[in-house]
Amino acid sequence: MRMKKQYATLGLALALAGCGGGQAVTQPTDTTLSQDMDTAKDAVGLERLAVAEQQYRAAGQRAVARDDVTAIGDAGYNLATVQLDEGKPQDALATLTATRSALATRGQTGDDAGLDLVQAGALHRLGRDTEAAAAAARAAGAQDTDIVEKAQFIRGLIADDSGDQATLASVDAYFAGLTGKLPDSWTADGKEIAARNLLVTGGSTQTAMQDAMQAATIRQTQVDYRNMARALGVAGRAAAKAGNAQAAAQFYARASQSARQAGDKASADRWAKLAGTAVAADPFALPTPSATPQKK
């Protein structure tokens, strides 16, 4: 059974690995495994991540029954990616560790750049940026250009958050050097990195704000709301640095509300704090139960 890579936006826009299709298959196909993988991928597209997690776990169990090293790697990678997008980075790391062990048992001992990529994202979420940067650097050496692009992007995020201006500048140069027709997601990543680099190097805050908003607009179109919210947060930083406190508060409020609805509570709380009193009431929130007087 041959597996192939399929790319989809998910949280940090990581790539999902898919099963079957697109190539001639010269041996019998395990339809149960294929259906589990396809059902999980469809669930991701509908943002039903709990269902996707369940189906990728089922796919992995089927892959173990089949003793299929490629399918085990794909299912483990996908399961960890979904767990990361669910806000469960510790679970993602546990899945990655177990997947690497299962692969090694079957003779695959070489480093897997895809697993390194997800590991970098999980470690970054946990604030373990030194380890995250090392994992992202390993992933950036992959042969797969999609993994390289996303690894470079994560390197830039880590560098900005940890004050590593040299690495952030090198990542900005990587994106600036890309040529030809690029995927929209790459353009958005490059714009966000450019905005971040401008803000730490004393560049134009207006350009930084424009770059961040271009990234946000692309991600809105791609239904990539978590990454869109983060770009809005960068626009807030640019407005704050420009001295426009009102615009900054509004950007932070928008980022906070979007992130909260997308399930990213930690980021939502952080941006809400930066927005201060500018956080508008959510018109779609459930009404707060009113206290009713107790009868005596």
What are the roles of these predicted feature ranges?
Residues 25-27, 65-68, 105-108, 141-144, ...:
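Short coil/turn linkers that connect adjacent helices within long alpha-helical scaffolds
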Residues 34-35, 73-74, 114, 150-153, ...:
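Residue register of alpha-helical TPR repeats
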Residues 46, 66, 86, 126, ...:
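Structural motif corresponding to the intra-repeat A-B loop/turn of tetratricopeptide repeats
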Residues 206, 250, 254-296:
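Terminal, low-structured helical/coil segments at or just beyond the last alpha-helical repeat
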